[in-house]
């Protein structure tokens, strides 16, 4: 072996440290003589490396990358020895760590060495699988740190920890060594002393003399050693001057004579502190000392024990007395005493009652209460206290020493196996076993080792546990040995009564390692991989090569040696799998021939891998040149305006057919067409001029290869078409409009006309003007043209006509000549030449939350034909100024002051006018101001409508054509229509916002209420359902119900979009002559976020939990996070409306359903009607179809239908459905299952990416005719119209829980799913079923006959209950039978009916009067309507009519006892029958009845009415 090493030391290898471009690996130079080799390396610029280090280099590089592996075998003199590492100083490792240190505290650095050169050793800590790690070792450096904070003190007792470290080399096979050592946990002063009593209350005789012992204070410390030493002092507080204390023993002495009488007491503060001051730890306690009479003496112990008591730790006799003490009370008249064994704060002071006592008379015995353990506690200090009847006490301390016994069996560390290589000589170390004995003294814990078997193969050192080999092993003969080791301690066992030491047994597996002495070889000499596509992805597997080696320990490493041009491929270092590494190109290389090497660390083998590349269509067509053309605008061409040509780079022959097809990319307006020859034709004429034309038009021509069939590749080429201008545009006016001309002005030039022409041709700028021949005679009379000037022929009177629209014909001078008519808007300026007259106006104000600031609300109006005369008027109050309003005398503007109360105000003014043409005069003006306070809830719960083709002034004003007293503005008409629609009074409806938008639309917000305000989804939902009706009543068009700035996709936001309602206390004013409106400035803005509404309040009677704002305490049954009622049931014909959802990037809908039938619409989110002005077709529908959930989603560009087909939903079982809507995917999951069978995926159709819906979310069904709506909106999939039958629970959308039990609009629902669900089943009818029915019918017939016969036999006295008070009396029996009672005429008691029975000819009229079941009843409206109906009823009786209350016979004056009784009014009336009227009359029954209203039955009562 030494010779081999010497040979290696004289052998050198020249290494090229830079990889060659083709091979990509290190290439060793050819071995030569030392000097020649050295010189050659210097010439080549390479580095000389000794051969003995070459193997390490080869192995290290091979492990790093297969591409860097050497392709030549190592030096032939390499012996291949593999020896195990060994720790240098394992026995000397004795690290210490202080307790309470943080994690990552340094412990120790271990080091192991390996005799083999260039070995890399990795370190690890050996521990059991479920053991919590307390240390971490750096695998490379061997540095050990803590991962745990240790506590040496009670109750943890972490005084030491055994650590086993394993060192493993990187040989083949890897060998290891272990080292076990003890880490001592050192104590620190981290515990303050703890007094052995919670309080000290002692007594002292009144004649006690100075230096007399008063009492003893005792404190313990959990710490160890000097850290546990405690000293005492009396703080200079209270009565400290009377006492002194021994700082070591804690004995308190009297310092000066007592000056207090019996019954009084002294108080001092005693401090116990550690002797070790770093860090300082102390504790304080108050001590009270009562002064007692001199005749009262404390008890004393008769036989105190002053020497320690020694106990073996294995003592198990719990009845035997350990110590006996006797005491006397020192009170002859009261000899009784009471003993107490103090339980201190530590285990050493009996905190866990390790010792107990038993008192018999004045004697006490102490015995064992728990087992002892020397390894935990070595000594105890017991404090026995004796007290007499005067509560005077005396203490005595007993010291107990615990003696160690051999009661622990040695145990082994976690290392259970070792390895020795085959053919190693005798004496080779195999492994080291370590065992430990937990006994506390060296007399019991020294461990020695011996082998129980296999002594002919191995030997063990009895002291160190090192196992060495006694022979040479052959792995092929036997590959492992199970060796049993016995660990014995050094004294007789206390566990077994045999005089032998404790022994621990453990079997260790020693494996015989294999040596690498065989060469690997490939299974094939040549591998072939065909048809590898050139567009194969990186890491695509091409082929796998495999080499075999007879040595089990050999790790074969693979590398590519040559042929890998451009690093196109890579090979798995250990797997042999060849994969694509770089992009391939068939046009560059069509075939690779790789040389692959297999290397086992010593020997190698080679094989060839041929990889053939297959061409794919991966190159787009290439156009031969850039293209442009110039043509005339507005001209058609029959032939090609341009021909383009492209070729396919994948086809080598450019003269061959290139199989290119052409098309127009983004053919807007279908203006172009192109054929496969590249001929571009013009389909529609092109315009060059503004506003819609362009000078240059861009055409994108797309070329696809492979004839456009299958997987084709395309490219797009831009073609520029330039247009030549022709004179095809007529000129138009560009004057600023309107043009003003003052009234009463003499004829003259009004304005110089200016025009423009979009054409660029010569002559386009030379224009002629004239009054159009089609103008009215009035225009032609009053106006004329003078060149390019408009001339006024007459004087104008604004009061006769305020403006004119004059048609001007303008012509250019181009060829051909172009002319057109433009309208000139002329306004006649006003001159104050008319006197004013008295006027009146009305101003309506909504004061939002009563917080309106000073607000201009409108001007004082007087009737005046002049418009521009404000500067000639002066305004003043007619009487005294109003304290709630201020008047601007110059402008007539009325300002409402702050805190103006709600109500109607009549204001009177005097307006004075004086101008050049009108003499000074004054008139009265009257303004009615109505102020209405609007709460915040009305705005938050408001509905909204966006109108078109109407201005805000037109909306609030009464049209001039309807200036009658009963005429209404559009705003008032809307308010009236909404009141009818919501079945409430007009006063309960507020139209409080009227805002004009820049796009000439008008936004109106409104609210309505019964008792609370109606939810916005109810308002918007009902209005949307009746949109056509409202449009007809108002003669207006609605662009949108529920104003939603996010409805049009990507109009406001590119991604998520949420509407936010902005509200301002500053009012918004709209002014017209006779009407002004001051409303709330409330509007919706789009926020580009996805946020669910924050639910900060508790619903349904819940209350916030104290100190937790987001937690609610709810009433039973309301289980939502904010007391929502989270369930609702439907019965197949109902529905419920809830708030809509926002358009989000990621919308998650989760709900639970319990179906009863297998068909029905569960959820619908989409439009409620068809609006041709804004045909948004987005919708979502979730339905059951034959028990399977089906989800249909349309983002507005096509519907996708997702059908789950794995889990069929059956009746009475609850299922969870999760829906995730994303921009590019739609997912539906059943029962929160993540398997592919439980998930159903789909992708949106078309370019749209969001669900944009502003209608309410509908559950259980919908009132919308989905079939008709689907036809109008061109839906490709129409949801099922049939309603859902079952229960829906726990609906959350984007983590917002819905209050399902409280919908805003509903029909046929069961909130909370409380009612039982009845389901119909069909039974088959067979012969047995028919027989059973016949038998049942026969039994019923027999029972009926028996009842009839029995009734015939009943006594007549029992037939009194069949009396009837109807007109045809069946049997009238009363005491006046001989009188003419049977002649009682019931017709006199009949009154004329209040209402006649009338058939409604118009079924819609009846339907219109029906209250919606969701409406909250308004009792005031109800009574008012009923009163109005009674007042208007022409068929009602007169107010004064005769009512007969007591009448018998035909004027008979005879009486009887019965008749007297029936007419008397002297007795109390009996109202017990009220309880039978049901729960609605329960209060009346409780007020007037004698019996409780909740009586189960009144059938036996005298006047029990049966309803």
UniProtKB/Swiss-Prot annotation:
Cysteines engaged in disulfide bonds, as pairs: 1098-1112, 1114-1123, 1287-1313
Signal peptide: 1-69
Phenotype upon loss of function: RNAi-mediated knockdown in segment A8 of the male genital disk causes loss of the normal dextral rotation of the genital plate and results in a phenotype with no rotation. During oocyte border cell migration, RNAi-mediated knockdown in either the border cells (BC) or in the surrounding nurse cells results in various BC migration defects such as BC deviating from their migration path or failing to sustain the directed, posterior movement. RNAi-mediated knockdown in the outer migratory BC disrupts distribution of Rac1 in the BC cluster but does not affect motility and cells remain clustered.
SUPFAM superfamilies: Cadherin-like (SSF49313), Concanavalin A-like lectins/glucanases (SSF49899)
EGF-like domain boundaries: 1084-1123
UniProt KW Repeat keyword: yes
Principal subcellular localization: membrane
Cytoplasmic side: 1350-1507
Membrane topology: Single-pass type I membrane protein
Post-translational modification: N-glycosylation is important for biosynthesis and function.
Any single Gene Ontology cellular-component annotation: catenin complex
CDD domains associated with the record: Cadherin_repeat, LamG
Region of interest called Interaction with Inx2, as start-end residue ranges on this chain: 1350-1507
Written domain comment of the UniProt record: Three calcium ions are usually bound at the interface of each cadherin domain and rigidify the connections, imparting a strong curvature to the full-length ectodomain.
Subunit structure: Interacts (via cytoplasmic region) with Inx2 (via cytoplasmic loop). Interacts with Hakai. Interacts with Myo31DF.
Job of this protein: Cadherins are calcium-dependent cell adhesion proteins. In connecting cells they preferentially interact with themselves in a homophilic manner; cadherins may thus contribute to the sorting of heterogeneous cell types. During oogenesis, integral component of the guidance mechanisms that regulate the directional persistent collective migration of the border cell (BC) cluster through the nurse cells to the oocyte. Functions downstream of the two chemoattractant receptors, Pvr and Egfr, to promote BC adhesion between the leader cells of the migrating cluster and the surrounding nurse cells.
Designated name of the protein: DE-cadherin
Organism field: Drosophila melanogaster (Fruit fly)
Gene: shg
């Amino acid at each position: 072996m030494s010779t081999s090493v010497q040979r290696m030391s004289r052998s050198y290898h020249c290494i090229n440290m830079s990889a060659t471009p083709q091979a990509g690996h290190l290439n060793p130079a050819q071995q030569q003589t030392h000097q020649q080799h050295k010189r050659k390396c210097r010439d080549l610029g390479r580095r000389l490396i000794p051969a003995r280090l070459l193997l390490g280099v080869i192995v290290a590089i091979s492990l790093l990358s297969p591409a860097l592996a050497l392709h030549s075998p190592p030096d032939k003199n390499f012996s291949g020895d593999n020896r195990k590492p060994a720790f240098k100083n394992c026995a000397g490792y004795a690290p210490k760590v202080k307790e309470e240190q943080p994690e990552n505290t340094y412990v120790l650095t271990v080091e192991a060495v390996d005799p083999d050169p260039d070995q890399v050793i990795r370190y690890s800590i050996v521990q059991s699988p479920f053991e919590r790690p307390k240390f971490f070792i750096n695998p490379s450096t061997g540095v050990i740190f803590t991962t745990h904070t240790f506590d040496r003190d009670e109750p943890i007792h972490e005084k030491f920890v055994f650590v086993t470290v394993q060192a493993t080399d990187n040989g083949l096979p890897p060998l290891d060594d272990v080292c076990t050592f003890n880490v001592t946990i050192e104590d620190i002063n981290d515990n303050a002393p703890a007094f052995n009593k919670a309080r000290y209350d002692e007594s002292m005789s009144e004649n006690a003399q100075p230096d007399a012992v008063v009492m003893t204070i005792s404190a313990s410390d959990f710490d160890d050693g000097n850290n546990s030493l405690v000293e005492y002092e009396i703080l200079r507080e209270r009565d400290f001057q009377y006492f002194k204390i021994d700082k070591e023993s804690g004995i308190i002495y009297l310092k000066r004579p007592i000056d207090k009488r019996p019954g009084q007491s002294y108080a001092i503060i005693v401090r116990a502190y550690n002797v070790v001051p770093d860090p300082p730890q102390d504790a304080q306690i108050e001590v009270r000392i009562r002064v007692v009479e001199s005749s009262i003496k404390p008890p004393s112990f008769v036989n105190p024990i002053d020497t320690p008591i020694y106990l073996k730790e294995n003592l198990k006799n719990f009845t035997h007395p350990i110590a006996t003490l006797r005491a006397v009370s020192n009170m002859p008249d009261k000899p009784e005493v009471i003993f107490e064994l103090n339980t201190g704060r530590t285990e050493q002071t009996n905190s866990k009652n390790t010792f107990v006592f038993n008192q018999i008379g004045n004697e006490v015995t102490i015995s064992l209460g728990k087992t002892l353990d020397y390894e935990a506690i070595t000594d105890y200090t017991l404090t026995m206290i004796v007290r007499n009847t005067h509560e005077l006490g005396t203490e005595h301390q007993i010291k107990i020493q615990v003696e160690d016994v051999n009661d622990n069996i040695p145990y082994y560390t976690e290392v259970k196996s070792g390895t020795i290589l085959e053919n190693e000589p005798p004496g080779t170390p195999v492994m080291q076993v370590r065992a430990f004995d937990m006994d506390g003294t060296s007399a019991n814990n020294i461990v020695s080792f011996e082998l129980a078997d296999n002594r002919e193969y191995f030997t063990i050192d009895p002291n160190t546990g090192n196992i060495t080999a006694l022979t040479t092993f052959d792995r092929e003969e036997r590959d492992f040995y199970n060796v049993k080791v016995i660990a014995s301690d050094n004294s007789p066992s206390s566990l077994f009564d045999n005089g032998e030491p404790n022994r621990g047994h453990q079997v260790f597996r020693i494996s015989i390692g294999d040596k690498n002495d065989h060469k690997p070889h490939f299974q094939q000499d040549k591998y072939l991989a065909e048809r590898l596509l050139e567009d194969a992805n990186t890491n695509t597997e091409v082929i796998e090569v495999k080499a075999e080696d007879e040595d089990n320990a050999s790790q074969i490493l693979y590398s590519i040696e040559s042929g890998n041009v451009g690093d196109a491929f890579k090979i798995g270092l250990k797997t042999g799998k060849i994969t694509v590494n770089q992009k391939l190109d068939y046009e560059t290389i069509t075939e690779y021939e790789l040389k692959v090497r297999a290397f086992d660390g010593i020997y190698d083998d080679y094989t060839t891998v041929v990889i053939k590349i297959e061409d794919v269509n991966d190159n787009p067509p290439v156009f031969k040149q850039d293209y442009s053309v110039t043509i005339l605008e507005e001209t058609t061409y029959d032939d090609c305006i341009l021909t383009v040509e492209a070729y396919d780079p994948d086809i080598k022959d450019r003269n061959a057919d290139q199989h290119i097809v052409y098309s127009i990319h983004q053919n807007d307006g279908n203006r172009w067409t192109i054929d496969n020859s590249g001929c571009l034709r013009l389909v529609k004429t092109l315009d060059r001029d503004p506003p819609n034309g362009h000078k240059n038009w861009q055409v994108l021509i797309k070329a696809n290869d492979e004839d456009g069939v299958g997987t084709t590749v395309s490219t797009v080429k831009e073609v520029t078409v330039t247009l030549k201008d022709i004179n095809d545009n007529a000129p138009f006016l560009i004057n600023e409009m309107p043009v003003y001309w003052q009234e009463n002005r003499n004829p003259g030039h009004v304005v110089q006309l200016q025009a423009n022409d979009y054409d660029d041709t010569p002559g386009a700028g030379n224009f002629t003007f004239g009054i159009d021949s089609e103008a009215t005679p009035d225009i032609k009379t009053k106006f004329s043209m003078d060149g390019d000037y408009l001339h006024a022929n007459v004087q104008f009177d604004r009061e006769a006509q305020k403006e004119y629209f004059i048609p001007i014909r303008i012509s250019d001078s181009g060829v051909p000549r172009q002319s057109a008519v433009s309208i000139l808007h002329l306004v006649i300026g006003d001159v104050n030449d008319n006197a004013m007259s008295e006027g009146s106006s009305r101003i309506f104000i909504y004061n939002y939350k009563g917080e309106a600031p000073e607000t201009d609300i409108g001007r004082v109006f007087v009737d005046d034909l002049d418009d521009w005369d404000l500067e000639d008027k002066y305004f003043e109050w007619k009487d005294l100024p109003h304290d709630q309003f201020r008047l601007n005398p110059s402008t007539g503007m009325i300002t409402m002051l702050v805190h103006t109360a709600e109500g109607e105000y009549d204001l009177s003014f005097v307006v004075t006018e004086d101008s050049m043409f009108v003499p000074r005069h004054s008139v009265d003006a009257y303004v009615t101001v109505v102020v209405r306070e609007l709460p915040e809830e009305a705005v938050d719960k408001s509905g909204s409508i966006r109108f078109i083709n109407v201005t805000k002034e037109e909306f609030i004003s009464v049209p001039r054509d309807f200036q009658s007293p009963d005429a209404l503005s559009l705003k008032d008409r809307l308010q009236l229509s909404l009141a009818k629609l919501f079945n409430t009074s007009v006063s309960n409806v507020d139209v409080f916002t009227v805002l004009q938008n820049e796009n000439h639309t008008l936004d109106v917000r409104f609210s309505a209420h019964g008792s609370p305000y109606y939810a916005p989804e109810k308002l918007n939902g009902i209005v949307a359902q009746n949109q056509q009706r409202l449009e007809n009543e108002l003669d207006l068009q609605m662009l949108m119900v529920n104003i939603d700035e996010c409805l049009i996709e990507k109009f406001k936001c590119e991604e998520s979009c949420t509407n936010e309602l902005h509200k301002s206390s500053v009012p918004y004013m709209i002014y017209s002559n006779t009407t002004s409106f001051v409303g709330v400035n409330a509007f919706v803005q789009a926020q580009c976020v996805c946020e669910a509404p924050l639910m900060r309040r508790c619903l349904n009677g819940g209350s916030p939990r104290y100190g937790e704002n987001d937690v609610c305490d709810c009433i039973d049954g309301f289980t939502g996070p904010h007391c929502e009622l989270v369930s609702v049931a439907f019965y197949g014909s109902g529905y419920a409306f809830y708030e809509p959802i926002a358009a989000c990037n990621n919308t998650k809908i989760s709900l639970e359903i319990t179906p009863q039938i297998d068909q029905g619409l569960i959820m619908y989110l989409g439009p409620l009607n068809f609006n041709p002005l804004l045909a948004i077709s987005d919708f979502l529908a979730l339905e059951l179809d034959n028990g399977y959930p089906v989800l249909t989603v349309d983002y507005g560009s096509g519907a996708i239908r997702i059908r789950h087909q794995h889990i069929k939903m059956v009746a009475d079982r609850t299922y969870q459905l999760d829906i995730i809507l994303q921009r590019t995917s739609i997912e539906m999951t059943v029962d929160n299952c993540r398997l592919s069978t439980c998930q159903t995926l789909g992708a949106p159709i078309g370019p749209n990416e969001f669900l944009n819906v502003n209608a309410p979310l509908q559950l259980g069904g919908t009132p919308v005719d989905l079939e008709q709506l689907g036809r109008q909106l061109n839906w490709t999939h129409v949801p099922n119209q049939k309603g859902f039958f079952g229960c829906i629970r726990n609906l959350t959308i984007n983590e917002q829980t819905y209050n399902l039990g409280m919908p805003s609009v509903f029909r046929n629902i069961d909130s909370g799913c409380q009612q039982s669900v009845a389901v119909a089943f069909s039974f088959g009818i067979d012969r047995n079923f028919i027989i059973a029915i016949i038998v049942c019918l026969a039994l019923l017939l027999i029972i009926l006959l028996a009842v009839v016969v029995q009734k015939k036999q009943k006594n007549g006295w029992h037939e009194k209950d069949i009396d009837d008070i109807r007109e045809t009396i069946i049997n009238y029996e009363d005491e006046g039978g001989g009188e003419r009672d049977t002649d009682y005429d019931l017709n006199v008691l009949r009154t004329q009916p209040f209402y006649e029975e009338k058939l409604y000819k118009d079924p819609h009229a009846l339907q219109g009067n029906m209250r919606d079941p969701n409406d909250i009843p308004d009792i005031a409206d109800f009574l008012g309507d009923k009163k109005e109906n009674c007042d208007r009823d022409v068929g009602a009786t007169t107010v004064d009519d005769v009512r007969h209350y007591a009448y018998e016979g035909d004027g008979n004056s005879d009486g009887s006892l019965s008749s007297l009784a029936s007419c008397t009014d002297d007795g109390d009336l009996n109202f017990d029958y009220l309880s039978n009227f049901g729960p609605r009359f329960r209060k009346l029954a409780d007020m007037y009845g004698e019996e409780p209203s909740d009586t189960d039955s009144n059938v036996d009562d005298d006047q029990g009415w049966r309803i």
